[in-house]
Amino acid sequence: YARYQEALHTNNAVDFDDLLMHAVLLLRNNVELRAKYQQKWQYLLVDEFQDTNAAQYELMQLLANAPLNNRNLFVVGDEDQSIYRFRGADYRNVQLFRRDFPDAVVVLLEQNYRSTQTILDVANSLIANNRNRTPKRLRTDNGQGIPVHVYEAYNEVEEAAFVADEIQKL
């Protein structure tokens, strides 16, 4: 890691995390610059909000908390779909958003257009075990569908062989 940081410095380069931190520090410490960008964008949209990290959350706050833009902020996210914890994402930003923006209207998207109800019932039973989540019940008009079969592989090689065999059966 030290060599990586040294290579960045030597090449006068930054990585994605550095870009975020530099932007946050600039906007946090420079009121005029912050006001410029708050005025530049009347609306802010953040998609996949459950996969934002602390720096991205603060960047959003710095840009949205402007008297002139009336906090015109639209975020889309679902704590149950967070998959980037290993990259610093924190699904709890969804709860922080509700705390920091108490006037925000929350719309639950529970209607599913892709899956059958059998699949959604399995998903509902799994996500019900997630902690610190917004309660919701996924549903569809696509019908019940066929039963879900579960296969537990011993390792990734066994899993790959199983998937290949299932594909061959198609």
Annotate each predicted stretch with a short phrase.
Residues 102-105, 110-170:
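Helicase P-loop NTPase motor core
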Residues 1-96, 108-115:
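Conserved helicase NTPase motor core
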Residues 98-100:
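ASCE P-loop NTPase helicase motor core
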